[in-house]
Amino acid sequence: MGTAHKLTSLTIFILLLLIGAGAQASPKEADTIDELLEMFDESSCMECHEEVHAQWSDSWHAKSVVSSLGGIHNFIEIGLKKEWETPLTKGQLLKCLDCHAPVINFASEKLAIEIGEMIVTAFKEKDSAASKAAKEQLARLNVGCLACHNIKATEVARGYNGPAEQGMIYGPRGDETDGAHETLKSDDLVQSAFCMQCHGIYKASDGETINCNTLSGSYQNSYIANGGSKTCQDCHLEKGHLFPGGHDIDTVRQGIGLEVEITPYQHLPGKLEGVKDEKLWVPSAVVTVFIDNKTGHRVPDG
């Protein structure tokens, strides 16, 4: 009986240690954007990855919030406020910003609501000083280096992987960095499932399923189901961290085959009103256009 009591006490002690360790490992929440970005400081990334940073700076990931102000504004003002009569909370805002600015996961409730209000101001009060000031702050929020290489790196199978380690850089190879930072190999980063966390069906923390776009659906149900094997990264990371898509003319040329057949002919106008000479041949043509979708999903899609 004494041994059983000791084992029970030891088990409880170990559980308390684990709970305590988990509590200590939980990252703090930021009360300002400055504090938030300091927690996930990416300024040193460009020192070693200058070319990658330059590519990313020209990508839509770099402006993922300010380029989507209209949609997020409508979610807050029309969806939450009018249709669902639901207050703006961090949990609700994350239904947009968990993808458009994953660092918001580490914002306090107060800061998250302030950011939501900034989005409304930036879109609603166009050309005003308040809108300009809000946009300047919102432009600092995006899908940056640590969004993919840390925050979302373990989310494909979080129940198995657990949350990303603070300060760890996850990459497809896990290369040594000569002490620049800790690196851990993650096979998830080269799988389509990684991209589909956001470019597909999103599962919110409250259980709501959100289908902002149908891209992953057509990829899985049409391309993969019919024997396709390429991943999102095979096409959209081919040029590096520009992540080109439908906005890039070279990517469009690669993804869409275009053939045009023109058959010229002549015809008589017949006895139509306004025809001066019904025996004068009229030059005409039949134009047939063939469009071939070479991508792994519907085009257009989003």
Model regions and ranges:
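Bacterial N-terminal signal peptides that target proteins for export
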Residues: 1-11
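Bacterial N-terminal signal peptides
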Residues: 9-20
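Catalytic cores of secreted or luminal carbohydrate-active enzymes
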Residues: 225-302
